[in-house]
């Protein structure tokens, strides 16, 4: 599934990490740029997991940070806490495409 949206970036301290356990997430900016953060540590949930959306949000320590812009993409692995849509200096709204790629449960069992 792909979702295209216009996003107003927020500062890192206002954003929570998110984690999807049954999906890979691939993001690319169509217009504008943003910062992102990834945690290699444990996610501490701030509310119950939304099983239907395969989404857990919470806090974690930042291990890696980077910048996403037109022509580049970021791939977040299943189970990997990340923040995206973070404000980059001098950048306003951005248009982005988010691809949600469902994992094959049978493949994981093997």
Where are these regions (language model features)?
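Conserved short histidine dyad/triad with adjacent acidic residue
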Residues: 2-22, 29-45, 78
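Short beta-strand-initiation
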Residues: 12, 21-23, 61, 69, ...
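A generic local secondary-structure boundary/capping motif
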Residues: 16, 87-89
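Short, conserved beta-strand element in jelly-roll/cupin
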Residues: 21-35, 40-42, 49-58, 67, ...
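A short hydrophobic beta-strand segment most commonly corresponding to one strand
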Residues: 26, 73-76, 91-108
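Short, surface-exposed beta-strand-loop junctions and turns on beta-sheet-rich folds
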Residues: 42-44, 82, 91
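Conserved metal-binding segment of the jelly-roll/cupin
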Residues: 59, 67-86
